[in-house]
């Protein structure tokens, strides 16, 4: 027959009916039954040290309340290269890699390349964006493209974000998948 633009998608649907995410996306989310969801967080080094420490403690607290195991790829008061962040995240391989970037944008970024995108990342970005009043945005930057985990970047003044809703969304999306 004729091979068209949607042939690969049609074949995936035949092989894995009722599943919207690719096999690669599904593999990223594998975890043993009953285990906690692991989220690795990177926080851009901005603001004074005390403000950063309070933000880190809040992340840990809200993550634990939502049943999420939090690890950090950053430390208060320290700058890291993107290569070191990517290497660390790929080594611990969390379910989700969450980045907070302080800038003027009001978006939640997920991976979207020329020929592929992260379906789970897009779903997370859409729901988190809705809760925080930010636009979901498909991008292909270094942190989104080179980490093996589902990656999300939350842009804006992150010290003013309601953190509890972020981890509730992540838990909810992953419980829907499993």
List the model feature ranges, each with a label.
Residues 1-178:
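Catalytic-site microenvironment of enzymes
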């Amino acid at each position: 027959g004729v091979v068209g633009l949607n042939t690969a998608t049609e074949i995936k649907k035949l092989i894995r009916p009722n599943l919207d995410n690719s096999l690669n996306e599904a593999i990223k989310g594998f975890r043993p039954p009953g285990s906690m969801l692991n989220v690795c967080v990177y926080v851009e080094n901005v603001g004074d040290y005390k403000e950063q420490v309070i933000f880190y403690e809040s992340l840990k607290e809200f993550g634990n309340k939502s049943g999420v195991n939090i690890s950090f790829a950053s430390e208060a008061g320290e700058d890291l290269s993107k290569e070191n962040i990517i290497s660390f995240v790929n080594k611990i391989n969390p379910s989700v890699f969450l980045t907070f970037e302080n800038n003027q944008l009001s978006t939640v970024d997920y991976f979207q390349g020329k020929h592929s995108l992260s379906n789970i990342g897009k779903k997370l970005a859409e729901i988190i964006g809705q809760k925080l009043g930010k636009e979901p945005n498909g991008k292909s930057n270094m942190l989104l493209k080179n980490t093996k985990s589902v990656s999300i970047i939350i842009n804006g003044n992150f010290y003013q974000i309601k953190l509890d809703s972020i981890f509730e969304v992540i838990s909810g999306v992953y419980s829907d998948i499993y």
